[in-house]
């Protein structure tokens, strides 16, 4: 059956609804839990790592509330093929950088970046062979920053501590 396209306002209030997540209620209830109880060990083992099927295993891996929100955001964003939610900004930054960087690559990062992002670059990424080059966020010569090993650039505008605004070309 062909579904009539929804208006943006309708999509906003209905996106992410799945009967498998909502049960008899209209919207997914808010799950405030990190741990889920199982009737027996066999049920626990069957649930491990299977969040993709909508089965709650452990809060850090998501919950029906989070899956519903991710589905809703994907539905509302034209051309999106999936949404990832993270519990913190640095977790999102780490996942994004780890998805594109490999040993030998260079990461460009503004010198006013959030301290946990700098710690990630100077610690974790460095141990895996990724070099980070910091630059003045007020630069006007972005071309001079790049070389053949540059794989990613992390910009913060405004900067988290100094609030400099970058003029990104």
Residue ranges and their predicted role:
Residues 159-169:
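Active-site core of PLP-dependent enzymes with the aminotransferase class I/II
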Residues 99-116:
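Conserved PLP-anchoring active-site segment centered on the Schiff-base-forming lysine
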Residues 1-53:
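N-terminal glycine-rich, Lys/His-bearing helix-loop that initiates the first secondary-structure elements
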Residues 75-77, 98-101:
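Glycine-rich helix-loop-beta junction characteristic of Rossmann-like nucleotide cofactor-binding loops
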Residues 139-150:
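Short amphipathic alpha-helix with an adjacent loop that forms part of the alpha/beta core around
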Residues 132-138:
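Short acidic-hydrophobic, aromatic-tinged amphipathic segments that line or gate anion-handling sites
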Residues 24, 73, 92, 107, ...:
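Buried hydrophobic positions in well-ordered alpha/beta secondary-structure cores of metabolic enzymes
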Residues 35, 40-91, 117-123:
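Conserved N-terminal alpha-helix of the aminotransferase class I/II PLP-enzyme fold
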């Amino acid at each position: 059956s062909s579904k009539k396209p929804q208006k943006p306002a309708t999509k906003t209030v209905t996106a992410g609804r799945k009967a498998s997540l909502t049960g008899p209620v209209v919207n997914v209830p808010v799950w405030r839990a990190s741990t889920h109880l199982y009737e027996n060990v066999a049920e626990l083992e069957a649930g491990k790592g299977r969040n993709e099927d909508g089965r709650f295993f452990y809060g850090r891996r998501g919950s029906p509330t989070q899956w519903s929100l991710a589905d809703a955001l994907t539905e509302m964003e034209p051309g999106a093929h999936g949404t990832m939610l993270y519990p913190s900004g640095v977790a999102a930054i780490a996942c994004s950088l780890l998805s594109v960087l490999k040993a030998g690559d260079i990461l460009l990062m503004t010198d006013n970046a959030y301290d946990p992002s700098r710690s990630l670059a100077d610690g974790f990424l460095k141990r895996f062979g990724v070099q980070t080059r910091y630059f003045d966020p007020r630069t006007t010569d972005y071309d001079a920053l790049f070389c053949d090993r540059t794989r990613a650039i992390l910009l913060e505008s405004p900067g988290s501590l100094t609030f400099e605004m970058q003029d990104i070309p």
